[in-house]
Structures are given as structure tokens and as C-alpha cells.
């Protein structure tokens, strides 16, 4: 069924926008004591430095110092950082991904997930780029995002779909489909958020 296939792809694209906006909202705006933005310290890989376990430990220390509750800590790794750990860390590779929960193995108190649309930061200022902004190759790199479930909230309203089939569309004789929803995902405080940004190569 071609119509059903198109609608399904539309729904997937719709969800992708929701998820990308949510992770952008949960990433800290800039580096502060309670919203640490760290840079990776690993070996150079192309135009950036790789993520290492030491970088995740540094983020844990920053959360501990900021007195962020240990329970409910989430770390969402971008695709580059997952690849870094898979290539460098045999233990991580052996425990990679739980097909039942969708989570990667737990690391240093963080429940770990993977998402390829994490935000970008300016590596000099450690400030987050606006949603949808095009990253500059000379200064901006992608991050992995950390947050505390105790410092975040989400609310999903109902989703309404609209469909007009070609047979009842005298203007263009095309099938028209659209969706509308109300959803929000935000930090409740400017704390308990963190990011590890790929550093520029030296």
C-alpha cells in the first residue's frame, strides 16, 4: 500500500524532529559549574579528537562536584563518540548495546544511549549552536549530551492526523497528508546538564 508507506515515512520524519528538538533542549547552553561542557582529549581522528573513557569520568566528576543526584543520570552519545569507544575500548565493544532496552552498557553511573542528531557547540566558547544552525567546519563540533532525569521534564499531547485523498481533492487531484502535535521536553533547572564536545585537532 503506497499511501500507508508514505504516511509511515512521514510519521518517522515527524518523530525525528521531536527527538532532535528534545536532545537540543536538554543540552546545556554554555559551560558553567552546574552545566559542564567538556572537550574530548583522545587521539586525533581527522579534524577532531576522539572521546575516551577518561572524558566520561571527567564528566562524572563534574556532576558529582555539582551535587547532581547519582540516580537518573543519562548520557546520550553521538555516533562519532560511540565509534571512538568501539574502536578503542574492547570492554565497551563487548558490552555494546542491549537489544531489549535500547541502551548501551552502563558507564560510571550513566545510563548510556546513542543518537546521531546531537547538538553542535563552538569549541572555543563552549556555547551551543541554535537549533538548526549550520555548524562551521573551522570552529564547531558535535557533542554527546548528559542530563539528569531529576532535572528534566517532558509532556506529550495528542497527535492529530489530517488526510485528504486525491478523489476528494478537485484543486490538485493529489493525496494530502499532514500531522499536528503538541510536545515539550525541557530542563526544569539550569543544572544537571552536561556535554562532551569533540575538540578540534591541535
Please give the residue ranges for each predicted region.
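Alpha-helical scaffold segments that mediate packing/assembly in large oligomeric complexes
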Residues: 1-66, 197-202
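Residue-level signal for secondary-structure boundary elements
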Residues: 18, 22, 34, 68-71, ...
Amino acid at each position: 500500500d503506497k499511501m500507508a508507506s508514505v504516511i509511515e515515512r512521514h510519521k518517522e520524519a515527524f518523530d525525528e524532529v521531536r527527538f532532535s528538538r528534545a536532545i537540543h533542549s536538554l543540552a546545556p547552553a554554555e559551560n558553567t559549574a552546574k552545566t559542564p561542557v567538556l572537550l574530548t582529549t583522545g587521539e586525533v581522528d581527522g579534524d577532531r579528537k576522539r572521546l575516551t573513557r577518561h572524558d566520561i569520568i571527567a564528566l562524572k566528576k563534574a556532576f558529582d562536584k555539582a551535587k547532581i543526584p547519582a540516580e537518573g543520570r543519562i548520557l546520550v552519545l553521538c555516533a562519532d563518540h560511540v565509534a571512538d569507544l568501539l574502536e578503542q575500548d574492547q570492554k565497551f565493544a563487548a558490552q555494546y548495546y542491549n537489544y531489549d532496552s535500547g541502551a548501551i552498557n552502563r558507564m560510571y553511573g550513566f545510563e548510556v544511549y546513542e543518537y546521531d542528531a546531537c547538538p553542535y557547540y563552538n569549541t572555543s566558547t563552549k556555547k551551543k549552536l541554535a537549533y538548526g544552525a549550520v555548524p562551521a567546519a573551522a570552529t564547531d563540533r558535535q557533542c554527546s549530551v548528559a542530563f539528569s532525569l531529576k532535572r528534566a521534564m517532558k509532556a506529550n499531547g495528542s497527535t492529530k492526523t489530517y488526510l485528504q485523498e486525491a478523489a476528494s481533492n478537485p484543486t490538485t487531484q493529489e493525496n494530502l497528508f499532514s500531522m499536528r502535535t503538541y510536545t515539550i521536553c525541557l530542563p526544569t533547572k539550569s543544572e544537571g546538564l552536561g556535554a562532551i564536545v569533540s575538540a578540534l585537532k591541535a
